[in-house]
């Protein structure tokens, strides 16, 4: 793993659907060189694949992010994202039917895992039911997260312009994101999250972030960078702005796209029933 390989991986966190041609241009590599490196990262198991993150708000659910000491493993059917951290801590994104439902689920987890170290539960969420077009695009991306617009068009029968417009809208709102599944031990890059009551003041994280969830000043930002040295600089700045910010270094992560697909299928089926 050299610096160029690490830059490839970090760039994929920021844009999991970036084409190899564009990636080669960004890194000043020939198409052949980039293709060789990309395939080697796949063959060596550094890149394990790609997955689709779908914000629960997009399928008419509420979400919260919570962290607990990892005394034991849990696998509830409402956990959509699980992140194992260096600090003997697990971070979970959970979904629910309402704010109160989420609070009940945090209480349920607390009975098994102890009191949470962090709870981020945005109150002013606005879940909604997606359009049929959005559902078709998401289903196609779940099958092939790095599918090009033309491939999605062939799969769904939708015009390429419609697909591109909807993807831009969904990605700009952090509702949908294609992410690489990286073996972080092999990759030797650093993925970290910061939770702060004043995350809005940490604009310096813009250069490394690939996911962001904010409500007013409060929020969570997730970043990827090529080295621990780079990460330490970001974390030092974060502590200077907010001494109480919570920092989590990721060692492994998983995303349950199947939960999103099931919820979207339920929405689709109910719409069909109502139309009869």
Task: Enumerate the predicted regions with their spans.
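A compositional/biophysical signature of low hydrophobicity enriched in polar/charged and small residues
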Residues: 1-276
């Amino acid at each position: 793993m050299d610096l160029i390989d690490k830059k490839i991986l970090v760039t994929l966190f920021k844009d999991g659907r970036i084409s190899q041609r564009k990636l080669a241009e960004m890194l000043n590599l020939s198409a052949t060189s980039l293709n060789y490196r990309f395939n080697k990262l796949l063959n060596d198991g550094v890149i394990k694949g790609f997955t689709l993150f779908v914000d629960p708000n997009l399928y008419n659910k509420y979400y919260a992010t919570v962290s607990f000491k990892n005394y034991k493993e849990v696998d509830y059917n409402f956990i959509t994202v699980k992140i194992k951290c260096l600090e003997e801590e697990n971070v979970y994104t959970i979904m629910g039917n309402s704010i109160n439902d989420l609070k009940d689920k945090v209480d349920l987890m607390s009975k098994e895992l102890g009191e949470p170290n962090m709870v981020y539960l945005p109150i002013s969420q606005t879940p909604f039911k997606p359009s049929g077009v959005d559902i078709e695009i998401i289903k196609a991306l779940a099958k092939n997260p790095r599918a090009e617009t033309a491939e999605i068009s062939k799969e769904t029968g939708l015009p390429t312009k419609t697909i591109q417009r909807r993807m831009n809208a969904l990605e700009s709102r952090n509702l949908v994101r294609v992410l690489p599944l990286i073996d972080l031990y092999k990759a030797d890059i650093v993925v970290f999250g910061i939770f702060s009551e004043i995350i809005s003041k940490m604009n310096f994280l813009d250069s490394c972030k690939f996911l962001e969830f904010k409500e007013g000043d409060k929020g969570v930002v997730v970043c990827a960078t090529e080295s621990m040295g780079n990460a330490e600089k970001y974390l030092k700045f974060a502590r200077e702005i907010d001494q109480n910010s919570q920092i989590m270094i990721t060692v492994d992560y998983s995303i349950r796209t199947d939960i999103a697909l099931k919820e979207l299928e339920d929405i689709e089926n109910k719409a069909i029933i109502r139309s009869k």
